[in-house]
Amino acid sequence: SAAVTIVEFYDYRCSPCIASHPELEQVRATEQDVRIVYGQLPIFGSHSVMAARAAIAAHLQGRFNAFHSALMTASAYPGMDSIYATAAEVGLDVEKLRADMRDPEVLQYLEEMRLLAEAA
């Protein structure tokens, strides 16, 4: 029911995406009439795809915002070890995350985000 919706397609290995994160977080925290919708668009290889799948899986556990923010503010681009470590740090069930990352619905959602980004 927000007056304005911002849709951000992002990749956890994208420098401009990472650079814009603090500003988007500021908007999310201070603007009541603005809604931010995040769409995964992994374009920088297999680690990007795995990080995107992990973010979707984190959403299934109700911890997307914490996981997303942790990856966006990390000191290095995420690899598999850091993805799982970050998941544990933000309180995710890592074994469930691993299973959900392989779920066909997660893979389908990721494909839908790609198609939506291409249409935008």
Task: Please state what every model-predicted region is.
Residues S1-H47, R102, V106-A120:
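Extracytoplasmic thiol/disulfide redox context detector
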Residues P42-A120:
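Cysteine-centric redox/oxidoreductase cores and disulfide-bonded domains
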